């Protein structure tokens, strides 16, 4: 599912945005956050009960958040493997092998989990603001189209664009 989210996002962006400068700019929190958002959003279309879908969605974002916290702990708070293992044990991951694998994965790629997590959370926050401001005019399609039309950018720019659009429309 992950690669398909990026494929759609990238093809859509290339179709809508022709300015060459846009292709050299990199906004990983938007890009990875969108992929995470699209993945988690897509679970509602599975042939499953609402309870099962909620579990899948909550598990996905909880896992992203847990790994982001581990990333911050290791790289910003200088956790060693023991400290990470203790942290993970408090969150239900109790085997030393699992803790070691997570530590080695995160130590090799500083900051790699944060764009997925922070990007997803920012997109959800912006979506909620958009939904509240748009009121009865809100549809998921409207928000998703707007998000994709703008394309990869910083979240402050995305928010300004959305706020400007909302002022025009409401």
Language model segments and positions:
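N-terminal maturation segment of proteins
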Residues: 3-170
